[in-house]
Structure formats: structure tokens, C-alpha cells
């Protein structure tokens, strides 16, 4: 058989479309490939093309669940090696994806958080050492910088003179990977109850759903890591009293999407809304349009995670528990609905999941 040498540009185009797990194995194939996989241009071009999947974690294990959207629709589940020291129990552990990196925060860690890329098996611990009550919030980056400049945000509560009768003060703390240090900021978020597991990172900024306990309004807050300020992104056109907490995700890598479903509804309708325009700082009001409505019977206690794939005929993919509390992946394409139950998961007391885009971005 004649040995064919492909043009290097064609080799790159092919490798852009290879899943990260396979690429990490290819590092030992040739030195040129290994060098290529470490270049920023390749990492960024690969991230643009890679398809989202789901991360699934139980009380003791973590899995990746990729979804095949071809004609033969199926899922592929792999157990991921745990490269986070001291993490032997995932209960009350939260993972927030940020361009392929995972921000890991657990209630059992005292003022500690981890940044993790499971595909590169890289982990970095971040610790807050000041004598204040402290809560980690999430990770983002300065989108105006070529090297992104990743940062972590948290908030602290303290008493200036440490006297019981003195008032408590709140400070926003920002960790910069470039300096490996913390700084305090005089910036604050709007009042409201932050809904757990609602964080989404988009173009470096962090977004989450907040509800007002008195008016039952739901709105989206954000933190701009470039300007290091909080913003009220928008008020959602429905309230928390009538609907489950909205579930956030991204859309087309430059917009937000929301999953909306009614409480105690007579129907199983689930609505998916997306922002009409790209997210930017033009100051224009945020407009939402309905992307699709689907009828799926799921558990009333389920917290779905989802993503939208425009490559395969406007596909909506959701992971959640069905009406029998069995964890399933749902694929909606046009009028066709495919339900695939996730089996073989070791989940004694706890199970959770989120959508995630795997990448070759190294931990900063």
C-alpha cells in the first residue's frame, strides 16, 4: 500500500474535530502533534468545534456522557479518573464549567476550591487564608486579553473590630491567576436569593439566576471579569412562584438559553428560550425568543441540564430524571424524541449532572 502524506493544513482540520480524549492519547504518536496540541491557536480552534456533553457525578465517581447525534442516536459513558486530592465524596460538591475548565467547590472544603481539566488530568488548588467568613462564587476571565487572564470571585463577611455589637461588612474578593493573589473590591450584587446549580460561564463572564423572595421575580445577574463589576443582566418575563427555577445554558457560544417549566402543571410542556441577539455591552434591552416547546414527562424534583446543537437540525439535548426517577438523556430533533436511559451508574445516595464542553485548555 502506498504511503500518503497529507498536507499539514488538512491534518490540522481533521484533528480539530477529534474528541479531546483521543487527542490526549495521540500525544505519543508524534512530536509534531504533541507540539500542535499545546499551541493556543489549536486549542482555541478545537474548542470552537467540539460538541458539548454531560458530566455526571455520584457520591463517589464521575462520568462523561457524550451524545451521538447521527442517525443511530446513542450515548457513550466513560468513568473519569479523579485527580482532585481530598475529594473522596462528591456530595455537596458543585462544578461550574468555563471553556473546558471546571471550577470545583465543596461545602466540606474550608475556604478551598479547585480548578480541574479532567481530560488533561490537571488540577490546581486555590485557598483563601484571611480570617473572614468566605464563600467561593465561580471562575471567569478577561475576554479583552489574548491570554484571557483567568480569575476567581468570592465574597467575605467580616466584623471590622471583631465586636459582637458592630455591624457586619461584605467584601467581594477576586483571585488573579497571574499574580496568585487576592484583592478586595468595593462592588456588590443585587439583593436576592441565588439559586444553586444555575451558574453559566459565557465569553469569560459568569451568569446566574436570582429570585426575589417578596415579589417572586426571577432575574439574571452577571459578573464582568474584565471590568470586575456586578451587573443585573435582565429580568426574566415570568416569576418563580408559578415556574420552577429557570435552568441556564449557552446557545451558539455567544448567547444564553433558558429552560422553563411550570410548577404542578397539567401538561409536561418544557419551553426553551434563547436570547435573540449576541451578548455584548451595547446597552440594548435583552430580548428573548422561544426556541421550541417539547412535551416530556420528567420527575417534579428533577433539575435538568441541557444544551442545544444547531449542527444537527436544531437539536435539543437534555439530561434529567424521568417520571420514574430514572436518569435519562432526551434528544429532540424536529418532531422526533429519543429517550435513552443511563445505566451502569454507581449512585448510592446522590447523583447530579451538568452540560460541559471538554477542551485541551491547560489549568492556568
Swiss-Prot record:
Kelch repeats lie at residues 156-205, 328-364. SUPFAM superfamilies: F-box domain. Keywords: Kelch repeat, Repeat. Pfam families: F-box (PF00646), FBA_1 (PF07734). Residues 1-50 form the F-box domain. The keyword Repeat applies. Transmembrane segments: none annotated. This is Putative F-box/kelch-repeat protein At1g12170. It comes from Arabidopsis thaliana (Mouse-ear cress). The lineage of its organism: Eukaryota, Viridiplantae, Streptophyta, Embryophyta, Tracheophyta.
